[in-house]
Structure formats: C-alpha cells, structure tokens
C-alpha cells in the first residue's frame, strides 16, 4: 500500500529538483499535482525535438515578421505598458521589462487566431530596454511550449536554454520547453522586442 505512494512522490521530486529549483514550488496547493503531470509529459516527450515546422501554421508567424513589426511600431506607442512584476511575484520591480497583449494588434491577432496550435491566453510582445539579466527560471507547467519571434533586436540579447544559446536577432524565432531551464542576458542599450506565443504540444 505505502509503496504505491512512492510513484507520485517520486514524480513530484523529479519535477521539483529540476534546475533551477523553484523556491515557490510548494506555495500553491495544486503545484505538486502539476509536478506529476509534468513528469508524465517529460516521459512521453523525452526525445521530442521542438521544431517550428512540426506545428501546422506556426511558420506563418515568421513569414509575416515585417508586417508584425510594422503594426507593432505603429500601435505600441499608443498603448499603456503592462509590467511583468505586476502579474508575477517572481519578477522584481523593473520598469524596463514590460509587455503589450496582442489583442491590441488586430492584424496579428487575426493571424494568430487562425493557427490552431497556438494558445492565445498569454500571447504578447515582451519588451526589454537596456542591459538586463533575467535569472534562470522555468514555467510551472510543461503543457505548452514557448515560441518567440524577435521583432526588434540587434544581437545584444541572448536566451539560454538546455539546447544552448539563441541570439535575439530581428526575424529569428525559437521554440522551446519553457518549463525547463532558461535565462536571458542582455548586454546592450538597444530595445529588444519579442513576440511570445504559447504552443500546444
């Protein structure tokens, strides 16, 4: 009987002990249950490569980079900035790290809604101004993958994942499991803008 408990406990421990360890892991009652689900998905998708072309329609985002950038440049200056530190206690107060929801960009929003593999609940343009380090972290759930397309970036900003370094240059994209280790290091003063989308596995 007690031996049966070892399975879920082991699955929770496996998820909890992933690098970097999430210090807020046990602050939510449902998080251990998410840990079991995460471990189960890790077992199923252990050898999966995250390639954009394997997700129907996702390639269209990069193809429309120029139009997306033009719409961002036109509309973003008219919008109020939303700050990550206001929605997530993990982030320290930082007025140079903010976002705009894509619902405010009608052409992009129309395109995204046509691509069935995209979950639009957190779809946004993420903006980093000036030098910045976002320390190693990971999402609570691995149910969704994270897609990023660089709208503005001159190469002074890099995203590090378990697969290595991705340099944020205009028009370049990446798909990765954001429930595993990733961190961001930006060394220059230029503004970096990325389109962030969550993608169903």
Regions found by a protein language model. Name each.
Residues 124-126, 150, 160, 185, ...:
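Residues in well-ordered beta-strands of folded domains
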């Amino acid at each position: 009987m007690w031996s049966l408990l070892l399975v879920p406990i082991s699955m929770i421990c496996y998820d909890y002990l992933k690098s970097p360890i999430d210090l807020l892991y046990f602050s939510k009652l449902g998080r251990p249950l998410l840990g079991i689900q995460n471990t189960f998905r890790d077992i199923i998708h252990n050898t999966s490569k995250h390639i954009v072309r394997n997700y129907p329609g996702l390639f269209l985002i990069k193809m429309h980079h120029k139009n997306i950038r033009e719409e961002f440049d036109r509309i973003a200056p008219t919008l109020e900035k939303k700050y990550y530190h206001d929605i997530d206690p993990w982030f320290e107060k930082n007025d140079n790290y903010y976002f705009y929801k894509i619902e405010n960009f009608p052409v992009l929003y129309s395109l995204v809604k046509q691509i069935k593999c995209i979950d639009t609940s957190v779809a946004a343009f993420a903006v980093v101004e000036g030098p910045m380090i976002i320390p190693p972290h990971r999402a609570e759930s691995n149910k969704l993958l994270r897609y990023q397309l660089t709208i503005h970036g001159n190469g002074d900003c890099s995203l590090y994942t378990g697969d290595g370094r991705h340099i944020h240059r205009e028009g370049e994209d990446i798909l990765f499991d954001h429930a595993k280790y990733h961190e961001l290091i930006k060394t220059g003063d230029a503004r970096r803008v990325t389109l962030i989308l969550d993608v169903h596995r």
